[in-house]
Amino acid sequence: MWRESPERQQPLRTGLTTGTCATACALAAARLLLTGKSCDECEVTLPKGRKVRLPIAECRRLDVYSAYAATVKDAGDDPDVTHGAQVFVIASLGTGAGEVRFSAADGVGTVTRDGLSLAVGEPAINPTPRRMIREHLLELADECAYNGAFDVAVGVENGAALAQKTMNPRLGIVGGLSILGTTGIVRPFSCSAYIASIHQGVDVARANGYDHIAACTGNASEDYARRHYDLPDMALIEMGDFAGALLKYLRRSPLRRLTIVGGFGKISKLACGHLDLHSKASEIDLDFIADAAGSLGATPNTLAAMRAANTSIEALRLAGDLPLGDLICRRAWEKAAYTMHNSMQLEVVAIDRQGLPVGAYAGEDL
């Protein structure tokens, strides 16, 4: 694991991205080829200028022109799917002055759909890691008076299996993981990778001709959207609890139509104005739900029972035939429309635990 950073006094420990790991491995392997010197530690410079040292688990020649180096990914205290995975690089010397060419080794995926920051057919090594690797290798080449090219194949042990726990299959990245990172540092529980995958999902849908997407809070809502709207998986966005991340992105980069589908409790949180729907960030407000029922004519006894309910669904059922679900969806629609602040067609649907609709609102103009 990488030597503890100055942040070690904080409760949560930062980690390093797969892009930083790949950079260290590429540099270690290339240095072995150009100088004959192996290493058990490698220093790299992050995009903002900070230097970090990574342990190199293995560094060896494969032949005269190629070498292998590997490190173990340390995500710090972040629950990263790649934490503990071995990232490796096979670096080779080639022809072409100043060129650095990239390919995917085992465990790194390939882009198969438009809309991402990489062209179709490219290995899923994102732009910042590519730039980091290129800059470090060209600096090494200058130090060693090397005028040729580098071919860099990046891989992750067991990456194909790990990728099934990520958004890569939905985004059209097949065969493995993506090599990620914009700062080189993993911030614990920052959720930046998940939010980035939401944005990428929107971009992929747009690039492939889908102008209607359904943002879903979970599996049941996704199943409902798939059945009810006949949308392909590419147009289904796993929003989860990050309503704000999606809505603010669509404010900057709109589509024609958005449908939000979620459990009634999650939709009630959005109706309250919460853009982070996770239980750690926002709570279901039974008073808010009861007040909405009161505006529809619920009796005092019903309102008292709703305020004392164990769950939002129980409160909804206590409202009986009152169109409470529709009203909560309308309030959520208003918050979402205000956040997007554009002319996108918008619909909000709330479902129960069985995946059945309990409320909907699509705006008076739709």
Swiss-Prot record:
The keyword Zinc does not apply. Keywords: Cobalamin biosynthesis, Methyltransferase, S-adenosyl-L-methionine, Transferase. Its EC number is 2.1.1.195. Pfam families: CbiD. InterPro entries: CbiD, CbiD_sf. Pathway: Cofactor biosynthesis; adenosylcobalamin biosynthesis; cob(II)yrinate a,c-diamide from sirohydrochlorin (anaerobic route): step 6/10. GO terms for molecular function: cobalt-precorrin-5B C1-methyltransferase activity. The keyword Transferase applies. GO terms for biological process: anaerobic cobalamin biosynthetic process; methylation. It catalyses: Co-precorrin-5B + S-adenosyl-L-methionine = Co-precorrin-6A + S-adenosyl-L-homocysteine. Belongs to the CbiD family. PANTHER family: COBALT-PRECORRIN-5B C(1)-METHYLTRANSFERASE. This is Cobalt-precorrin-5B C(1)-methyltransferase. It comes from Hahella chejuensis (strain KCTC 2396). The gene is cbiD.
